[in-house]
Amino acid sequence: MEDGAPYGASVRESLVHVLDTARELGFRTENMDGHLGWCEYGEGDEMVAVLGHLDVVPAGDGWSCDPFGGELRGGKIWGRGATDDKGPAIASLFALAALRDSGLPIRRRIRILFGCNEEAGSDDIKYYLANGGEIPVMGFTPDGEYPVINGEKGIINVTFSHANVQTGDVRLLSIHGGTAPNVVPAHACAKLACPRELAQRLANL
């Protein structure tokens, strides 16, 4: 593991870029050892959090453009994470700048959290809390839909195993599919040992 890059160099690069942008916009920032970063605007004892994240699920195959190129087509940005969650996170940053520039008075600080491990279990938030990260009085994620979604209730990753006891003419040699636990597999592959006639029938399905 690289220093300051607990979730990989590319995620660290995204975090450094967004925090640099936030500083250029005039916001206070903090980088929590590459696990998570935040920027903040306003004064007051209480804080409202906007929880975004910069990591993405694996890009997979079948793209007609560079999945990390941010290509603009028809007024839309195409790329992995454009809607979940880089686009909403950056939109929140510029919305915060617009709010500040409007001069509208606010009673609480607004902090945008830029997570780096949401897609793989949210260890970034655990690190934030374990290292003195302030708990907000309220918060929301910017990538939801209407009507309001009242929180995800959790995730369970399960590993199954079974003794390789097989009889008959068909034997399963291997099976695999998918790139991450929270991604619908684009394809799956099974390797079978079976009589040639059956293999031909399967090939003709």
Label the model's feature ranges.
Residues 47-114, 120, 137:
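Active-site metal-coordination/substrate-binding segment of hydrolases
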Residues 40, 115, 193-195:
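Short hydrophobic/aromatic beta-strand micro-patches
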Residues 1-51, 57-59:
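N-terminal helical capping/dimerization or prosegment-like subdomains
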